[in-house]
């Protein structure tokens, strides 16, 4: 069987040797010239080809018509690509009757794209592998001929994992190539719903953000240590590179980046601490961590972090309208952990954000967006990123106060959108999973799913269509007037500070808060229509991390994008959520402060929400955009979220009871 080979790197050498060993008639080898700016730790495909007496080429553009014609003249039966860095055109792939096959360094459909070995380490994966798949127009998306799994240990680095992948590629090809000579293999289509895509990495991506967990930072160190440029941070203007590290489960009260000790050299992280085992100063030697501290004059309580700019760089100003709300206060906390941001906020209350009021990077005014229009316009003009988070987003209000929902959620927010257009400011707008309505797709896709709502007499859809219309207006302003925007769609975010029990008492809260109130007060848990409706519950910390990356907007990756933010693996019915809450409630240390459980009570939606309500059976997000654009993946299990949310409300309820007047307690 005549083959044309496109190859580079060690895997390219493995592939070339495997084809020769399997007896393929290799007509030509295409590779790349050496890049003098690259640390070449891998073998040369050109040398292997020369040793095998094969013709080898390194064209600037292999898809040029001249090269396409030369390949046509060779009449290949099959084409192989082994870590070749450029996409092959459809015209080239059509020249081989058996098609083209690519060897990719991951277990597709996960980790499509560039640098999969580095990315799996960055993300803390415990397993990866190699995949031989048919090449199609879309990168790394073709049907699979075979895979070989590789375990990732806690101490693997990019180099050690690369060696494992090289061995795995050898085993996979030894198994598949002889069989492919005999005839076409059965191919397995990839599941697009499971696909994730990652882009190329640069040396700048090795910068350490100390507010992340020690586990996450250690994964970065492993992913970019030698032969790559390394993970790095700064002590003032001086750069230090960390080559080896160890995460420590250490409790501290220091700011992220603070040096906790110099022997061993240990640095505080957002969660835990990182021990620096070996490192290197900018002009120094590769040394042990304690020696590095001596050479660079690192002392306890000094902070490592970003390189200070020679010119004072202004912080990015973020305006959050509705800053005291659930998303607003959690987002503020995340932004203030990063020295690059300054937050301006407006809301009608301040109970949830009182912990930030002493922070010099936080500026708050108590007010109503329908009244303080001049203040809002001034601050839109002053700030860089605008997040209008004010909205009525509780289902009972959609039927109880539909006009108020329209006035606030649409009309007031439209003014803000127009001010963003007027002053050329970027808006990050909270769309909603509700816009999908009764969509009949299994997963709701931002770019292809239909937005289906009920008849006019079902007033519950006024929230959905208000948000949808704003989405369309924002999109149109982007197309016609260059408005910079990102639309994000939260799917049932949960966590501490979601609503409050007083809101639940008047029925104006989310489902979990209402369920917790029933437990706290000893009233039956009301399950609307039996609680059969399924939702995908997302931990607030997962959601906020995705939203933070949208605000960060590296290289403008989020401009003009619509991004679902949800956790498809945390799908559960409302009844299952209630049962999970009940179990956690019965096992909680404060259980004795509350009345006995009063049971479950099924209730019709019309009796609970009123006339004009209509529900949907499920609401499952596709998160391919979030994975591809943000390199984000939800991590927190639903049980943890439920436990933490319940704990927050139970402690608040106990404090409320303790503070209540005696006559009220005896009533």
Curated annotation (Swiss-Prot):
Catalyzed reactions per annotation: UDP-alpha-D-glucuronate + NAD(+) = UDP-beta-L-threo-pentopyranos-4-ulose + CO2 + NADH; UDP-4-amino-4-deoxy-beta-L-arabinose + (6R)-10-formyltetrahydrofolate = UDP-4-deoxy-4-formamido-beta-L-arabinose + (6S)-5,6,7,8-tetrahydrofolate + H(+)
Record GO terms (molecular function): carboxy-lyase activity; UDP-4-amino-4-deoxy-L-arabinose formyltransferase activity; UDP-glucuronate dehydrogenase activity
Pathway(s) this gene product operates in, as recorded in its UniProt entry: Nucleotide-sugar biosynthesis; UDP-4-deoxy-4-formamido-beta-L-arabinose biosynthesis; UDP-4-deoxy-4-formamido-beta-L-arabinose from UDP-alpha-D-glucuronate: step 1/3; Nucleotide-sugar biosynthesis; UDP-4-deoxy-4-formamido-beta-L-arabinose biosynthesis; UDP-4-deoxy-4-formamido-beta-L-arabinose from UDP-alpha-D-glucuronate: step 3/3; Bacterial outer membrane biogenesis; lipopolysaccharide biosynthesis
Keyword Cell membrane among record annotations: no
Induction details: Activated by low magnesium concentrations, via the two-component regulatory system PhoP/PhoQ.
UniProt keywords, alphabetically: Antibiotic resistance, Lipid A biosynthesis, Lipid biosynthesis, Lipid metabolism, Lipopolysaccharide biosynthesis, Multifunctional enzyme, NAD, Oxidoreductase, Transferase
GO biological process terms held by the UniProt record: lipid A biosynthetic process; lipopolysaccharide biosynthetic process; response to antibiotic
Residue runs in coiled coils: none
Entry EC no(s): 2.1.2.13, 1.1.1.305
Chain spans, region Formyltransferase ArnAFT: 1-304
Alphabetical list of InterPro entries matching this protein: Arna-like_SDR_e (IPR045869), Bifun_polymyxin_resist_ArnA (IPR021168), Epimerase_deHydtase (IPR001509), Formyl_trans_C (IPR005793), Formyl_transf_N (IPR002376), Formyl_transf_N_sf (IPR036477), Formyl_transferase-like_C_sf (IPR011034), Lipid_A_modif_metabolic_enz (IPR050177)
Residues carrying the site annotation Transition state stabilizer: 102
Binding site for (6R)-10-formyltetrahydrofolate: 114, 136-140
Binding locations of NAD(+): 347, 368-369
Keyword DNA damage: no
NCBIfam families referenced in this protein's UniProt entry, alphabetically: PRK06988.1, PRK08125.1, PRK11908.1
Role summary: Bifunctional enzyme that catalyzes the oxidative decarboxylation of UDP-glucuronic acid (UDP-GlcUA) to UDP-4-keto-arabinose (UDP-Ara4O) and the addition of a formyl group to UDP-4-amino-4-deoxy-L-arabinose (UDP-L-Ara4N) to form UDP-L-4-formamido-arabinose (UDP-L-Ara4FN). The modified arabinose is attached to lipid A and is required for resistance to polymyxin and cationic antimicrobial peptides.
Annotated family: In the N-terminal section; belongs to the Fmt family. UDP-L-Ara4N formyltransferase subfamily.
Name used for this protein in its record: Bifunctional polymyxin resistance protein ArnA
Gene source species: Yersinia pseudotuberculosis serotype I (strain IP32953)
């Amino acid at each position: 069987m005549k083959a044309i080979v496109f190859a580079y790197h060690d895997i390219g050498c493995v592939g070339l040797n495997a084809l020769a060993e399997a007896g393929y008639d290799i007509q030509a080898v295409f590779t790349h010239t050496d890049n003098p700016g690259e640390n070449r730790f891998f073998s040369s495909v050109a040398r292997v080809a020369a040793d095998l007496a094969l013709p080898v080429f390194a064209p600037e553009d292999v898809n040029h018509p001249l090269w396409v014609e030369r390949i046509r003249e060779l009449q290949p039966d099959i084409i192989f690509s082994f870590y070749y860095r450029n996409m092959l055109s459809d015209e080239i792939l059509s020249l081989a009757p058996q098609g083209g096959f690519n060897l990719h360094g991951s277990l597709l459909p996960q980790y499509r794209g560039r640098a999969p070995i580095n990315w799996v380490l960055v993300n803390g994966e415990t397993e990866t592998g190699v995949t031989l798949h048919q090449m199609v127009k879309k990168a790394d998306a073709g049907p699979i001929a075979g895979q070989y799994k590789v375990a990732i240990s806690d101490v693997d680095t990019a180099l050690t994992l690369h060696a494992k992948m090289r061995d795995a590629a050898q085993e996979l090809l030894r198994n598949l190539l002889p069989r492919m000579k005999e005839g076409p293999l059965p191919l397995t289509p990839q599941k697009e719903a499971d696909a994730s895509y990652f882009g190329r990495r640069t040396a700048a991506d090795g910068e350490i953000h100390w507010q992340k967990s020690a586990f996450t930072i250690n994964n970065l160190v492993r992913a970019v240590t030698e032969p790559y440029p390394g993970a790095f941070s700064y002590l003032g203007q001086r750069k230090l590179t960390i080559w080896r590290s160890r995460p420590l489960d250490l409790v501290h009260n220091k700011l992220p980046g603070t040096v906790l000790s110099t022997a061993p050299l240990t640095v505080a992280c957002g969660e835990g601490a990182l021990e620096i085992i070996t490192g290197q100063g900018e002009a120094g030697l590769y040394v042990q961590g304690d020696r590095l501290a001596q050479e660079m004059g690192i002392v306890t309580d000094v902070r490592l972090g970003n390189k200070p700019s020679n010119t004072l760089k202004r912080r990015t100003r973020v305006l959050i309208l509705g800053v005291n709300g659930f998303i607003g206060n959690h987002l503020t906390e995340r932004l203030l952990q990063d020295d690059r941001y300054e937050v301006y906020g407006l809301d009608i209350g301040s109970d949830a954000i009182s912990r930030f009021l002493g922070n010099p990077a936080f500026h708050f005014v108590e007010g109503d967006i329908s009244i303080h229009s001049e203040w809002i316009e001034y601050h839109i003009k002053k700030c860089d990123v605008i997040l209008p988070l004010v909205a009525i987003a509780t289902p009972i209000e959609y039927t109880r106060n539909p006009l108020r929902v329209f006035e606030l959620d649409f009309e007031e927010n439209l003014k803000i959108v127009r001010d963003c257009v007027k002053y050329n400011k970027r808006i990050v707008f909270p769309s909603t999973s509700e816009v999908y309505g009764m969509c009949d797709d299994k997963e709701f896709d931002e770019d292809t799913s239909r937005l289906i709502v009920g008849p006019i007499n079902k007033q519950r859809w006024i929230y959905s269509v208000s948000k949808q219309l704003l989405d369309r207006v924002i999109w149109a302003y982007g197309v016609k007037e260059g408005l910079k925007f990102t639309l994000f769609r939260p799917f049932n975010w949960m966590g501490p500070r979601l609503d409050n029990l007083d809101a639940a008492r008047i029925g104006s809260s989310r489902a979990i808060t209402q369920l917790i109130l029933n437990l706290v007060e000893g009233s039956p848990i009301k399950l609307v229509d039996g609680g059969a409706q399924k939702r995908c519950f997302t931990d607030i910390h997962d959601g906020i991390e995705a939203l933070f990356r949208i605000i960060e907007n590296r290289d403008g990756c989020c401009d003009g994008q619509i991004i679902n933010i949800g956790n498809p693996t945390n799908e559960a019915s409302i009844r299952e959520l209630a049962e999970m809450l009940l179990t956690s409630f019965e096992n909680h240390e404060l259980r004795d402060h509350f009345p006995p459980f009063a049971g479950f009570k099924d209730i019709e939606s019309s009796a609970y929400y009123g006339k004009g309500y209509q529900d949907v059976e499920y609401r499952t997000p596709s998160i391919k955009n979030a994975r591809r654009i943000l390199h984000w993946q939800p991590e927190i299990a639903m049980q943890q979220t439920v436990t933490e949310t319940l704990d927050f409300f139970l402690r608040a309820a106990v404090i409320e009871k303790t503070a209540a007047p005696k006559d009220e307690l005896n009533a």
